[in-house]
Curated annotation (Swiss-Prot):
Subcellular compartments: Cytoplasm
GO cellular component, one term: cytoplasm
Pfam families on file: EF_TS
HAMAP family per UniProt: EF_Ts
Taxonomic source organism: Pseudomonas putida (strain ATCC 47054 / DSM 6125 / CFBP 8728 / NCIMB 11950 / KT2440)
Function statement: Associates with the EF-Tu.GDP complex and induces the exchange of GDP to GTP. It remains bound to the aminoacyl-tRNA.EF-Tu.GTP complex up to the GTP hydrolysis stage on the ribosome.
Region (Involved in Mg(2+) ion dislocation from EF-Tu): 80-83
Tagged with keyword Cytoplasm: yes
Name of the protein in its database record: Elongation factor Ts
Gene3D superfamilies noted in UniProt: 1.10.286.20, DNA helicase RuvA subunit, C-terminal domain, Elongation factor Ts, dimerisation domain
Main location: cytoplasm
């Protein structure tokens, strides 16, 4: 049996895209024979799944489950929206959500580990990368959730009130995507950034104006920014005549927290250059 050196593990990892520990195990099983290790990994479908792991998965689905006092919000990504609509993917998401809820998981790491075999099987079958990206669990007196087309999900925790109110506020969160619960959470740095952006965008309008007028303009913009960014100060989407905070207060409730997920949020999607791809294929064919 050949010695399982770090260099050998590194070579197998570079050739297959698999993780270090998986490569080490494969080499140990193959008696240090790297070619046999690769064949074994190919036969198990591991390499196919590992290679797909490098592909950007920015589509997918948001899933949520709640029992009125707790909820789990989950995002699972796929490479294409087409796969996200298929039963195999939907079943994977549903099973992952059920496991996370039943085990009261508070983050994605243990779920990713326990669902890895199922994920690899799905990747091998569908030919796309699939990732469990993130998970949040919340608990409280009253918990409501809203899911919009499996692409946007929101969860709201209330102290007082009822599930229907929490669900309606979650619907508002899904529609408005507030940044903060209330204006007291907005940092001085965020306000300063907003002020600087306002000054840059309105340089021509404020040029030559008295300092007190400029200050009033800035204060007006900051007040508007706080109202737009804060959940409690936003106009309720189902009744713009009332603010969300006032809605909760009238119902004898207090909004404790909210969580918002949108599929692919923050993931940089690759831009396909079809012309360049065709040109590359033509050039390769001429060689």
């Amino acid at each position: 049996m050949a010695a399982i050196t770090a260099a050998l593990v590194k070579e197998l990892r570079e050739r297959t895209g698999e993780g270090m520990m998986d490569c080490k195990k494969a080499l140990e099983k193959a008696g240090g024979d790297i070619e046999k290790a690769i064949d074994d990994m190919r036969a198990s479908g591991a390499i196919k799944a590992a290679k797909k792991a490098g592909n950007v998965a920015a589509e997918g689905a948001i899933a949520v489950k709640t029992d009125g006092t707790s909820a789990v919000l989950l995002e699972v990504n796929s490479q294409t929206d087409f796969l996200a609509l298929q039963d195999d993917f939907k079943n994977f998401v549903a099973e992952s959500l059920e496991e996370a809820f039943a085990q009261k998981l508070t983050d994605a790491a243990p779920l990713i580990a326990s669902r890895e075999a199922a994920r690899e099987a799905l990747v091998a079958k569908c030919g796309e990368n699939v990732n469990i990206r993130r998970l949040v669990r919340v608990e409280g007196d009253v918990v409501g959730a809203y899911l919009h087309g499996n692409k946007i999900g929101a969860v709201v925790v209330l102290k007082g009130g009822d599930v229907e109110l929490a669900k309606n506020i979650a619907m508002h969160v899904a529609a408005s995507n507030p940044e903060f619960l209330d204006s007291s959470e907005i940092s001085a740095e965020a306000i300063e950034r907003e002020k600087n952006v306002f000054l840059q965008l309105n340089a021509d309008k404020i040029a030559g104006k008295p300092e007190n007028i400029v200050e009033n303009m800035i204060n007006g913009r900051i007040t508007k920014f706080k109202a737009e960014a804060s959940l409690k100060e936003q106009a309720f989407v189902m009744n713009p005549e009332i603010k969300v905070g006032e809605l909760a207060k009238k119902a004898g409730a207090e909004i404790v927290s909210f969580t918002y997920f949108k599929v692919g949020e923050g993931i940089e999607k690759p831009v396909d250059d079809f012309a360049a791809e065709v040109a590359a294929q033509v050039a390769a064919a001429k060689q």
